[in-house]
Amino acid sequence: MNNYKIYIAIICLLFAFGCSKKFEAEPLDRITGDLIFDPLDKNADYAKQFLNGTYLLLPDWYNRIDGSFLDAGTDDAVPSRIGTQAEFYRTGRISSTTLPDDVWSKNYLGIRRANLFLSKVDVVPTTAVLKTQFKAEARFLRAYFYFELVKRWGGVPLIGDKVYTINDDINVPRNTLDECYAYIVAELDAIKSSLLPYAITDGDWGRANIGAAMALKSRVLLYAASPLSNPTNNIQKWALAAQAAADVKALGYTLVTDWVANFNATKNTEFIFIKQNVLNTNIEINNGPIGYLQGLGLTSPSQNLVDAFLMLDGKAISDAGSTYDSNNPYLNRDPRLTATIMHNGKNWLGRPVETFEGGQDKPGGNRTQTRTGYYLRKFMGKFETSTTYTNQAHHVILLRYAEILLNHAEALNESGGAVADIVNNLVLIRKRAGILPGSNNLYGLSLTLSKDELRKIIQNERRIELAFEEHRTWDLRRWKLAEIELNKPVRGVQIIKNGTAYSYTYFNAANAVFDTKMYWYPIPQAEILANNKMVQNPGWPN
């Protein structure tokens, strides 16, 4: 293929990414047949590049909603800049025309690209083994894109392998929620053995493998079993979710010992599936405290989240017998607190963070700064004693083993599993975090906990272990707790320095409004207008 053809192929790909209507026929299918899917491309180089481009449509986390994390629309944080679109979620301002997290078109574009790949890759004269693997990867990506749609909107149109053309009828009804879950799971089951194995080479890192398919299945079945999707509490759904998580555990993934370094690794035993990024300092600059270098401090974690972190002995700060000291609130806490959140007095770039009133990181005035008394620390490199930021790996860790352990604990608890098995999953999480083992070697847990007690513990463990990894938004919805937790104010702390001592006053940093119709996103108005069979979600006007 000469340079001119390669150039045209690239233009075609860019055009595909720019298309905004998911069912409208794009000329992509007419111009890629002999350019990207080339009968002379014996190594499948261009087909692989097209597939790689489809991977780029996988989700991002970092500051993606108008400069904020999606979690800044929950009770875990607020955007430091007032009025950013992430606040629409907390204030109830989303609508079918105002949806900052509108990934409908993006995910249907991914589905279309996967279908186009499946329909054309057979003309490429590469090996049957490689074709089988690539087809399985395309189907995995398609399943992932469908789940991104389903967790937001519920049932969506399933279009199978069809690649729509200009002359096709694009009026397609929504499938039911259960049909969508069943389709995704069936696809993952069908292709898992054709994907790369559990152990993959460095050159294939970031590609879907059997672990990714099984881990995504675990997540999908957990959502399908949860109250939002399972209002009758069908225990069999929880049992299926428990088995799916157990199957992933059997593959051999393990937790890494260094919780902080985990998020700047390129490859390790905990990562199951990642979206790769180039080395950069974007997270540090966008979220670092404003008194350092170019720190923009765009994310303000909440007091609500700070209070969720345990004491070092594994007890909640509100537990009877807790050693929590209101005059020294960050002392003897779960190490994940200071690994997730910058609080006053934490060392960073060679000096203590100053979020007291008038401090270097909370100077007052009109400059964007923390609204809660906290800054984000998670995902950053170990710069506590450094003088400057250096490039770090900031891959998007889409699936990791810690989530699987939490999935297993939750599904076992809801399906009537043995308390010891449930607790063992949590012990692994807490032990790695640095919680003390205690006299019973159960890291603040016990084998006499009730189902309801374990449920609360598991939910809180997910909150702190997976903070800012885009789980809180969906967890609160699938548990049907959003109407409770997201109607509470998001709290912050005002710190006054008195000599060498500090006083702490807690306040409401932002109000919150959650209506039950917000459990499911409104379908974008443009999709309703374009498809006369598309039915809007309950409570939302067209």
Where are the predicted features?
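Membrane-proximal, proline-rich intrinsically disordered regions
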Residues: 19-66, 310-322, 527-542
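Conserved, well-structured interaction surfaces
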Residues: 41-52, 56-61, 83-153, 169-182, ...
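Hydrophobic, small-residue-rich alpha-helical packing segments that form membrane-like cores
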Residues: 158-261
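Flexible, polar/acidic helix-loop-strand segments at domain edges
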Residues: 325-401
